[in-house]
Amino acid sequence: MAASDPTNALLREAVRRLAPVLPLLTELGSRFVDAGHEIALVGGPVRDAFLGRVSPDLDLTTSAGPDQSEAILAAWADASWDVGRAFGTIGARKGDHVIEVTTYRADAYDRVSRKPVVAFGDNLLDDLARRDFAINAMAMRLPSLEFVDPYDGLADLALRTLRTPGAPEVSFGDDPLRMMRAARFVSQLGLTAAPPVVTAMTDMASSLAIVSAERVRDEFVKLMLGSAPRQGLALFVETGLAAHVLPELPALKLELDEHHRHKDVYEHSLIVLEQAIALEGPPDGPASSVPGPDLVLRLAALLHDIGKPATRRFEDDNGVSFHHHEMVGAKMTARRMRAMRFDKDTTKAVSRLVELHLRFHGYGDGEWTDSAVRRYVTDAGPLLPRLNRLTRSDCTTRNVRKARTLSRIYDDLELRIARLMAQEQLDAVRPELDGNEIAEVLGIAPGPVLGRAYKHLLAVRMDQGLIGREAAAEALRGWWAEQPESDTVT
């Protein structure tokens, strides 16, 4: 059957994308064929070439065993190494390209742990049959460049759909992590999961519990960093996967009362995420622009309101409140991210942004004082560029006048921050006298009283800005005269 126009377009794009590496691939392919083996480019690099994307990896599969692959690569590449001989994988570098060659696999899966029982195969088609999705079960034989697509993965790419090579229940039963990969590919590649895939994910979501938290986290991170995380998250939530990984997310689907006294928090959170992504800077931009994709900003946008279900209260005036939801949410964020095995720095940054996301609104609608600006910047610290974007994103009101007012106030705040930063080092605000100088002025030794004195001068610095060392010393003496301990110092 003749290829459709979309398929032909994809084929042309693949040839164009692979052109820079085709000489290298055909050279390596000839080495393997001359030694009596089959070899093919497989999986992600083939898929990405059809999508017009440059894949950083060159993954190949071969009939050669790992010892044979290692011998061929050692004689051809600039360097070679053992990636995972037990899994049949040998790595190599040729020029600027990194290559991984893996022996055909015909794994079975342990019925309890679902971990693969590694077995090497003897033909390409069997290897492709065990792959997770049809779009990843495409290959290009080398050096002939024959395209092999037994499960119509190319047609799936043209239709932007995601299917498994065989029955999805069998595929997900073999490795439940593939359900997370489905949500990730929806986010990364803008695909739609086929109905049988969605059904199987829904029926088998609970089996994800046997997969390690680290593996699940890695797929979730890739989902969040994709080009369409909202779509991936929707699949993640609707199939029930989220209930086993991030239950706080579906919990945001608060049941609205008959008066609809608050917005849909789940929908609001997804909109905030999309708006935060729109404010990310280019990948090669300065840190102040928050180069995208930025995991910390995206996680904070998604989770900023997770404290609302626990703090929702219906008031007597038919209103609804979520008092202190930012504080509750920060603790919930840290707890969940630790359970998902996120690193400490990322966990701390995301939970701090959740805690600070209402700070802008705490200053009211009036003009910001210099003191308020200093405290805002100091509280945010190095997270300020992200907090700026999170705060701007957290405006999903349909009231155009209100949205314009908030935008104007925030524009003014950013101007104020820029002006003060030109005059002062706002990202490292400290008193104009250090601890030793405070002790000398007051005639006291290090201890709790000195700490209180330091905090007082820091408050003076916040409220009044740079007033000079003499004025700071005078303010310190005035404060000291009111302290009970001053009577005991001679």
Go through each PLM region and give its residues.
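Catalytic cores of the polymerase beta-like nucleotidyltransferase superfamily
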Residues: 1-490
